[in-house]
Amino acid sequence: MAVPSELKYSKEHEWVKVEGNTVTIGITEYAQGELGDIVFVELPEVDDEINEGDTFGSVESVKTVSELYAPVSGKVVESNEELEDSPEFVNESPYEKAWMVKVELSDESQLDDLLSADQYKEMIGE
């Protein structure tokens, strides 16, 4: 199972790619595998504020609906609109095509609370 080493991870199975003061957020390969085939993705609008630990959207699979939890706080600067028409990207390409949102960080110190790839692998039993 892919757990890219350059990313950070939340305990709620979101991944975070840090690029300066902006982060890209998605869900992990492990999470999409647990959910099954994704049929719908609901994401916030550009300029929405998200807060660490709060829900910022959801993914619906054939099995269940799962909330997305913000691993950091900040302002949404981009939302992946392709997922509206192609939610299957979450299953096919969780780390590339299926990023969820890009967020301008309001508190960079929150990144310190995230897990490294090794810590995340340990958490999921890899």
From Swiss-Prot:
What does this protein's UniProt record list under function?
The glycine cleavage system catalyzes the degradation of glycine. The H protein shuttles the methylamine group of glycine from the P protein to the T protein.
Q: Name one GO biological process term.
A: glycine decarboxylation via glycine cleavage system
All residue ranges annotated as the Lipoyl-binding domain in the record: 22-104
Q: Name one Pfam family in it.
A: GCV_H
Alphabetical GO CC annotations of the entry are: cytosol; glycine cleavage complex
Domain of life the protein comes from: Bacteria
Keyword ATP-binding (UniProt): no
Q: What InterPro entries is this protein classified in? A: 2-oxoA_DH_lipoyl-BS, Biotin_lipoyl, GCV_H, GCV_H/Fam206, GCV_H_sub, Single_hybrid_motif
What does this protein need as cofactor? Answer: (R)-lipoate
HAMAP family, per database record = GcvH
In terms of PROSITE patterns, this protein maps to: BIOTINYL_LIPOYL, LIPOYL
Q: How is the cofactor bound?
A: Binds 1 lipoyl cofactor covalently.
Q: What is this protein called?
A: Glycine cleavage system H protein
Q: Which family does it belong to?
A: Belongs to the GcvH family.
Keywords associated with the record: Lipoyl
| PTM sites of type N6-lipoyllysine | K63
